[in-house]
């Protein structure tokens, strides 16, 4: 078994974030993460097991990390992960591969809207520079550990793109 607890991965480890197109229900989340764990238990690169970890945050974000000191993930191993997630998503009626929406927190809930919809929400003042948004493009475990996944829009690229008139250089 190559899967390890997430906290055992080094800060410089490789990270992937897969946003679920909707929040998973309790039982659905359990089945989902068990299926992911089953895949990660056997995940290999060039026949060698990858020391890896996975977790589901907020029943919405699948986080997968790899200890690159142990074995580097190959293009084929990454493709196998993406293909498995695409199939799993299809089986339960969600998308896990689409990073184009903007993910933001509204109270206790996580919302997902198109970029044009988020721009309209920003223009209307419904979302602000203080709105917490999610950066699903993180690639290092360190960034996840320092809280870069969820931060105010003012601290992310979202602030520059959607609040241009409110952000100073």
Locate each region found by the language model.
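N-terminal catalytic cores of peptidoglycan-degrading enzymes
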Residues: 1-16
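Terminal interaction module
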Residues: 97-169
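Short, flexible active-site-proximal loops enriched in glycine and acidic residues
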Residues: 50-53, 91-101
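Long, hydrophobic N-terminal alpha-helical segment
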Residues: 12-58
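Helix-adjacent hinge/juxtasegments
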Residues: 69-96
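A generic structural motif
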Residues: 21-24, 67-73
